[in-house]
Regions:
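A gly/ser-rich beta-alpha-beta helix-loop segment of oxidoreductase catalytic cores
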Residues: 120-143
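Short Ser/Thr-interspersed hydrophobic loop/turn segments at strand-loop and sheet-helix junctions
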Residues: 75-79, 170, 186-190, 213-217
């Protein structure tokens, strides 16, 4: 087990230490999982995370706020044990982030399902031409009576092809740049919705290109107000950017654990590698970088939890480091 002394930092409260202990026990009993069939593995992980009550932290009830420190602790711990487990948790939070922060009572029924692990979610923002440049989204949402008709494409969408519900960002008004964008909650079985292509990466996880062809959704599918899409997307990303750093921190802690184990067990000239001053220096540098990263990550999370409206600077620093 990695060093847990960082939990005594002033960023954390007793509930975070209790959460960390529960997570360690759950991970030891359930991870890693078989990655042979990635789709099946992700679905099984989401169901297991839901049964364990871990997905409760992926979204907030109406009137409550997300505990970003808890999100970071969960992502760090899961990533240290199994990267796919971290992915599965993170996508439930990111996918339903807009609903958690801005959704109507009707839309929040989906949040209950995703937090229970009974439905998978996805965040459909990135496009083939504009990438993640939200201001240049081209997918359109044309008002037609009581409905909106969506046309366009999204790509590199995590959980694409296996998600039950998607948050889709589209241009609903004739306005330039960030203005005129809206967010829609779209079930995967909506007519006109197509998984155009499944995408492969070096580290396998579900990714897809989506295509919308005259896809009709009711006005009640819109999340928040018309034209609020940019603000909604930035609010969601603002929360989850610091958690990206937390996942990387989990990978780094695992690397340090493995390094120390190897240096302790591997002998050269009749002595462990760990006795060599040069090796000790490298391990010390790793530990220093990990603590520096953790301080940046949990500073950002603590700042958000204490009421900051935006943590773009702090989260960007944490993610960069």
């Amino acid at each position: 087990m990695s060093d847990k002394s960082f939990l005594n930092w002033p960023f954390f409260e007793p509930r975070h230490r209790e959460l960390s202990a529960m997570l360690e026990a759950w991970c030891a009993a359930n991870l890693p999982v078989d990655h042979t069939d990635i789709d099946t593995a992700c679905k099984s992980l989401v169901a297991a995370l839901g049964r364990a009550g871990i997905l409760v932290h992926s979204g907030a009830d109406a009137g409550e706020t997300l505990d970003v420190r808890a999100l970071c602790l969960i992502r760090e711990t899961l990533a240290r044990h199994d990267g796919l487990a971290d992915f599965s948790f993170a996508m439930q939070g990111l996918g339903m982030g807009a609903v958690s922060l801005f959704g109507s009572a009707e839309q929040r029924d989906w949040l209950k399902k995703t937090r229970a692990g009974k439905a998978l979610s996805a965040f459909a923002l990135t496009e083939p031409a504009s990438g993640s440049d939200v201001a240049n989204i081209a997918t359109s949402a044309r008002k037609d009576g009581p409905d909106y008709i969506l046309n366009g494409e999204k790509t590199w969408i995590s959980n694409g092809g296996i998600a039950d519900i998607y948050v889709v960002f589209a241009r609903s008004e004739d306005a330039p740049g960030a203005k005129g964008l809206s967010a829609f909650l779209v079930p995967a079985d909506t007519p006109g919705f197509m998984i155009a292509e499944r995408l492969e990466t070096i580290a396998p996880h579900p990714l897809a290109r989506l295509k919308f062809t005259d896809m009709r959704v009711p006005a009640s599918a819109m999340i928040g107000e018309p034209g609020a899409g940019f603000r909604i997307s930035m609010s969601v990303l603002d929360v989850f950017r610091s958690t990206v750093g937390a996942a990387a921190l989990g990978f780094a802690r695992r690397a340090l654990d493995e390094t120390i184990k190897r240096a302790t067990n591997r002998e050269i000239g009749g002595k462990p590698l760990a006795d060599l001053q040069m090796v000790q220096g490298h391990i010390a540098d790793m530990a220093l970088d990990i603590d520096a990263a953790a301080l940046l990550i949990y500073r950002a999370a603590w700042t958000k939890d204490k009421g900051a409206v935006r943590i773009s600077r702090e989260a960007a620093m944490a993610k960069l480091y």
